[in-house]
């Protein structure tokens, strides 16, 4: 587990993603062979320009979480955004979930807030262009993400 007070991140050498787990979340991990709806709230910062370039936490998008269908196939995660409920899809015109967003799924729990002490899974990621969305890979820039994940219904 990373120490958020010391700004610690873990680097994954196989893909170049850096991850900090702020909260592992309540609930259970996505099981092998399982497909689930996962809901995300996020801020996306372009590290080249040091600006927030996309978020679904702004008032304009307050009613829309990014919904994705995630499948765990023997520990390998694949996912697509729901075209009708995704700020990422609307902004980048693609339902492909950035590979970097899937890295935490091995380590976090996906649940729903049912009791006062339940928490959403919360991570911070530094995602290189090769693991990001098409716009980031085409224009070669890394992004910093602050994301919460929860299991949908």
Language-model features: locations:
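Cross-family detector of peptidyl-prolyl cis-trans isomerase
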Residues: 1-153
